[in-house]
Each structure stands twice: as C-alpha cells, then as structure tokens.
C-alpha cells in the first residue's frame, strides 16, 4: 500500500511543478456566481455584426414561420390547417416533409462566399431547432437527422469547413435545448421536470458532441421549454465548456439556459428576440433579429413589404452598436438549399456599406453619448485609443450643413472627415456645445455610399 502511494506521489505533484512565469488557467465552478465572472472573449465585442441562419425541415412547407409544426399540430391555427388541407394529401405527417428536404442545391462554399461578402464577422447556424431534426448525424436523433434522412449529408460539417477555409468569420452554432414533441421531454414535463431523462439522454450528449466535433466559437442556446436551468444541468455543462472544452479560450455563450437565466446569466445577453433597447446597457448584449419581419425561417408567402429595407437594416446595425450591442441578422434558406435572392441582396448591400463605414463599427467602443439629442438619426461610436469619435448620420441634410449637438471641438486640434471621401471638412463651433460641419458638395455618383454616412471627428470631447 505504501509502495503504491510512493509511486503515485510524482503524479500528484505534477500540477505543482509548473515552470516559472506559467500561471494556472482560471477555473470556473458549476454555479452562476462563478460562471458569470468569466470575461467575454474580446473577439466578440470587436466583431459587432453576425449572420444567423435558420434552416431545417420547416423550410420545406415554408409557410407562416419556423414554428409551422407547432402551429399546425398543437395550436391548430386555421391558416396552417387550411394550408395542409389545400396542399397535401390526407394523413400527411410533418415527418413526411423530411423526404422533400433534399438540400439539392446546398453549396457550402457558395454560402460562405455570400457570408464573407456581407461584412459579418461571425455566423450562427441552427444545428437543431425545436422540431428536433439535427443538421448533423447525431446518434441521439435516430432517423431524424440530416445524415440518415433528407439531405443525407453532414450539413454542419460542410458549412463549418467552408466558413473556416474561405472566410474570416467565427463559426457558431444554435441549439434548441428542448423539442416540442419528443416523448422523453413530454414525460419529464409531466413530472414538473423532476425527471431528467431527456437532458441526460438527448440534450447534454448532443451539446458535448457538437462542441467536440465542430468546435463552435459561439454556442447559441435556446428553447428551455419552461424548464429551469438545473433541469438542463446548464451550469455543469458551461463549467466544462469554459474549463476543459477545445474552445474554452474563445467560445462565447448567450443567456438562454433555462427559465430565469435570460437577461441575467451567461456570456452575453439577448433578453428577447429583436431586443433593441436604444440605450447603453452595463452588460454586453446582442440584438438577434430577422430581415423578414415575421419569421426566422423562409416563407414562400412573404411579400416584398415584409422584408426590411437596407436603410432599415443599416439603422438597426448603427443604433445597436452605438448602444454597445452586436447585431445578429437572420436569413432563412429554402428547402432545396438556396439563399433567396432578396436575402443575398441584403447581405451584399450590408457588405458594401461596411466597406466604407466599417471603421466606425468594428472594434469600436461606446461614446459618452449614444445618439445626438439635437439632430435626429445621428449615432456615435468611438476609438478612444486613437482619440476618434464617429458620428454616423442616416439622413443627408438638404442644407449641406450638419449640426452635431454633442461633440465639443477645439480650434487647431479638431479635424473632421467623411469616411470614403477623405478630404478635411470645414466646421464651426457652436455655443455652449456642438459643431456645425460643412458637408462636401457631391453628386449621387460621388457619394461614398448610399444608406448612411460617417464623419470622423478627431480630438473632440
């Protein structure tokens, strides 16, 4: 017994024999108090703009929203019942849509190129929505995954490889904790979540598999199904994610880990869908929103007025970043794997705008004022290390003069330029504060961009 202990002693002492100058990595306990102390990896705040992709079996009926199955079978909303009666044979089940979910035209490289053109710095892809269909070959989702059925391809892997090989975007995954109609979840739910058969046999094994196999740098949890975080063992999983996982140094997480966690616990806050407070928050947050005003998934019945214009999208990006948030802008591909032209157009338009104005978005900080209280539709960001303030204005004044009520300029020190024009602009000081900028006389074709412009102000207070 003593000999065995002596042989084991060197192994026990190994953690103490670190080289000088090497510090032990921070370790987090499986409690919110400990987990919430983890610093958010810097890349996320610097990124500012990401793309959300909702794609699944729901993309085949492509009617109403990605909640099609629930609205049809559970709530039995008349428009969904009528849609099925008018378009599919009696007895057609939701599971039958998977045969039609071919992803025939899905080209991960093409998707990656479009994402790169958008100017986004990260992408979050739905690995599994509330319908339970996994977009990779999960052995916990037998005959209800993209490798066994439908596309018969590992969609997650194909997109991950394309994004990492062809773009500079960080790759992230969305995962729904619960599933609407999974019998084990329904059984646990009927016990008021005293039983934990579903998370133990389904949710947690899939989460560990996703992280180990695809190494996402964003893990976007959703869908607690009315269950508390301890039912999902969220703190235990996150402790492993932060301490031991292959992405422990770079991964960011959101706040949807069980009832009571949203807008309170997690890496960054989402608070609600399309959350956009319009003022500065003390915690990093994200505005996850949709180009289609009414759905995250593709809708075949959508009209042109249902889509946000590029002007509206630029405004959402600017006001979100000015208030310290990131914008996660959603698109919904079709069942055959194509990105609808209107989504591609919006993505490329955002990229065009960011090529000119990205300096005022990426790696910026909030300023002492988020927006101008005198002139509407003017939002501020800053780079204090360079003594720069950016004033992003969404309406070009007819007079050619833009009054900014917040900055205080100094004669001989303050300089003003228009991003994409790069000629010093004349400005005058106003009392008691503010400056008036003489904008350049430009024709439509000389404009550096079309949907919002940025003034770079140096040495203002």
Curated annotation (Swiss-Prot):
The keyword Secreted applies. One of its GO terms (biological process) is fucose metabolic process. GO terms for molecular function: alpha-L-fucosidase activity. Its EC number is 3.2.1.51. The record marks 288 as: May be important for catalysis. Residues 1-25 form the signal peptide. InterPro entries: FUC_metazoa-typ (IPR016286), Fucosidase_C (IPR031919), Glyco_hydro_29 (IPR000933), Glyco_hydro_29_CS (IPR018526), Glyco_hydro_b (IPR013780), Glycoside_hydrolase_SF (IPR017853). Homotetramer. Alpha-L-fucosidase is responsible for hydrolyzing the alpha-1,6-linked fucose joined to the reducing-end N-acetylglucosamine of the carbohydrate moieties of glycoproteins. This is Plasma alpha-L-fucosidase. It comes from Mus musculus.
